[in-house]
């Protein structure tokens, strides 16, 4: 929005960090004056996010969600993806877990479930030598997910599971069969299938 653009400009030129506190106080006062106006709450979340206060922003999202009961789930989902992109893996996992706790009937459950496992895969494999127990547990969780998510939603799960099997657990043949079966079942969009086939080539090379 125009207001956010202006605030962004002001914050970018805030040399000594004094403006940030003034803006926060002003928004909080507005929220107290008009508690029903969600735009001020969203502005506060945006402000915290700009300042890198992700924990505080996420707590604010939870508070709105509990108060309004509807509509905030997609905001939390988007925020979780943003946290993941900023490598805030633990906070992202927490955000998606919060959504999953709402139950399988919830409209964002599937998306949260897939993102949760995708981040768990990224987090587990981001260390130099992941613990074998962690890898086996991850493999089991991804395998269970494969039977639960819809066919067209399974790309991220398959991609993670193939990588875990082939490059961490030395289960090359299982990884190859998983890819071949998934292609046969038409689980992928054309661009996803290209990536998976390149992965298959890497595994064949490893397997020789």
Regions found by a protein language model. Give the residues of each.
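Acidic, polar-rich low-complexity tracts and alpha-helical solenoid repeat scaffolds
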Residues: 1-208
């Amino acid at each position: 929005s125009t207001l956010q653009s202006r605030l962004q400009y002001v914050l970018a030129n805030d040399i000594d960090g004094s403006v940030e506190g003034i803006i926060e106080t002003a928004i909080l006062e507005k929220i107290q004056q008009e508690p029903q106006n969600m735009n001020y709450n969203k502005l506060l979340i945006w402000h915290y996010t700009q300042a890198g206060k992700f924990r505080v922003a996420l707590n604010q999202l939870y508070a709105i969600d509990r108060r309004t009961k509807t509509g905030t789930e997609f905001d939390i989902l988007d925020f979780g993806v943003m946290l993941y992109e900023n490598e805030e893996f633990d906070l992202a996992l927490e955000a998606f877990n919060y959504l999953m706790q709402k139950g399988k009937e919830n409209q964002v459950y599937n998306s949260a479930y897939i993102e949760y496992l995708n981040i768990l895969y990224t987090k587990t494999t981001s260390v130099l030598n992941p613990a074998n127990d962690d890898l086996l547990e991850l493999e089991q969780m991804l395998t269970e997910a494969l039977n639960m998510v819809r066919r067209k939603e399974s790309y991220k799960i398959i991609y993670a599971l193939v990588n875990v099997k082939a490059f961490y657990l030395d289960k090359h043949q299982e990884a190859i069969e998983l890819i071949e079966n998934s292609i046969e079942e038409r689980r992928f969009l054309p661009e996803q299938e290209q990536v998976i086939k390149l992965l298959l080539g890497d595994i064949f090379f490893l397997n020789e």
